[in-house]
């Protein structure tokens, strides 16, 4: 396609606007195995950018499980789970997820994004109302749009605003669904789950909780925010991913048998896509076993989180109760400059900018496999960089 084609000329104009606003993004290439230290664009750096909270993505046991599954079953599932793509391994993983979450059943999707898309659009339509937290993940927001339901947002974690919307609108719709992240991925704070459950019950409303950043991190056994708040076996829908603390790929929905059976028959993003590969499925299953058998991994993660929060809590830290720590900066230029300086000194903690978030920040993801030396080194460098860039009026 010629660059001068007038039909596509708007693309260059749009890109120029994105660059002018400092919103332009390009991927950075990692050429090593996942871990607390990675090789990024040829440079060895300590990795504070990964969602691999337990350090399992490079664990030999996950790798061996993936290899064994590939040798036994091939590289791909080769079809929809309803045609030629279903394997016993999928069923084993779903049972393991249900056991972890203490739900009746679970369903594995090819990604967490697809799990949210498919679930929300299957259980709601134009006769229904969806109320979502303002800071929800894109997959929750776009799944709601896809459903055709009326979609309203409430201010972040503002239960009074949510209640007011329900009092005003609930009676006008057949069914209603409240959607929320359990851990808000760009802030690190938690949803107010017990209160949300009480409101959902009062207004006869379904509740869907996205545990993407909670599973493997929070809860007595690592089951997530639902377990953390002692809300296990309450009437709700749990959605999550296998690609963060569990170190693999894919997504899941956990809930009642009726819900899961319904989704097998109505969730388009499960029905009309190839099943999760044997390698990814086996790796996720191995990760769940490790999560349950090695609680010390999660304990070490929280020790690392506590050290960082204690040392850096007065550096514009956004309130956090998770492995995601965000530090506010005045504008995208400051955030980009600080992210570049951190990288130059051997620490990968990227700048996050609008439109992904309302305000610019450095986002730090903590891992169980960060060593004490790496934690202390990061604290020292971060303090120096933050003092320099947070006060830079010329950026």
From Swiss-Prot:
GO terms for molecular function: 8-amino-7-oxononanoate synthase activity; pyridoxal phosphate binding. Its cofactor is pyridoxal 5'-phosphate. Substrate binds at residues 25, 137, 356. It catalyses: 6-carboxyhexanoyl-[ACP] + L-alanine + H(+) = (8S)-8-amino-7-oxononanoate + holo-[ACP] + CO2. Homodimer. Belongs to the class-II pyridoxal-phosphate-dependent aminotransferase family. BioF subfamily. Catalyzes the decarboxylative condensation of pimeloyl-[acyl-carrier protein] and L-alanine to produce 8-amino-7-oxononanoate (AON), [acyl-carrier protein], and carbon dioxide. This is Putative 8-amino-7-oxononanoate synthase. The gene is bioF.
